[in-house]
Amino acid sequence: MSSRNSQANKAAAREKLRAERERQAKKDRVRRQVIVAGAGVLLLAVVGGVAYLVKQANEPTYWEKAAKAELVKPKNTTGDDGTTVVLGKADAKKTLELYEDSRCPACAAFEQAVGEQVKKDVDAGKYKLRYIGATFIDNAAKGEGSKNALSALGAALNVSPEAFLDYKAALYSKELHPEETVDSFAKDDYLIKVADTVPALKGNAEFKKGVEDGTYDRWAMEMSKSFDKSGVTGTPTLKMDGKKIDTPSTPDAFTTAIDAALKG
């Protein structure tokens, strides 16, 4: 009797062990299936993420799209693409070419020192002023403020030549011109804030809409191309009769340089 009980107990133990092993094997299979499925989901997510990043990388940027958008030329411009901006009296015999980038600190220093004298000379008919806008600092310092400010200048030029000159002076003013590495001009609301210091632009709904809608973004890109084709490599640059004028830092030095160029 004792021997039979012992054999029965052993059989029961073996059956219990077998059942336990089957349960464990089943758990292991389920675990492996979960791991494989999870790895598959992760792989799909990674592949999908990579595909999305590749697609995004190949998508044109906002300004690349703007370069192919409809061209709207501001008033007070000439030329097929509206990038010839000449201000002043028609009977002025010579034209001063001024190359500037809105983010350029040296341009700001020049405008703060000499800008008012330039405006007086143009108003007096001493010479005409041709403006050529650049955007290369956006590439060098990263950002889009040069392009955005140039577009806003187009909106100001559409109002009037005087509004354009006053707005340009405000953009370069000591109070409102940011550091070269600070891309404040990339923000429409900042450009409108600057415009609020210009009587002809303050509260001007057409100007505001032109800035916010990017009406002159394509024009800004065309103007930038015009600068790139000019051969000028830095700003500010002044030219008269195709000859470069050393950039003066005071009104008196500017007048001396201009008078010499006018006689040349």
Please identify what each model-predicted range represents:
Residues 2-36, 49-60, 194-264:
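C-terminal cap of thioredoxin/glutaredoxin-like
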Residues 40-48:
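Core hydrophobic alpha-helical transmembrane segments of single-pass membrane proteins
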Residues 57-123, 133:
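Extracytoplasmic low-complexity, Pro/Thr/Ser/Ala/Gly-rich segments
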Residues 77, 172-185, 211-218, 253-258:
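Short secondary-structure transition/capping segments
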Residues 90, 123-124, 159, 230-233:
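Extracellular/periplasmic catalytic domains that process cell-envelope and extracellular macromolecules
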Residues 93-95, 125-128, 162-165, 202-203, ...:
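Loop/turn elements at helix/coil->beta-strand transitions in domains of secreted/extracellular proteins
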Residues 102, 108-184, 188:
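Structural alpha/beta surface segment adjacent to cysteine/selenocysteine redox centers
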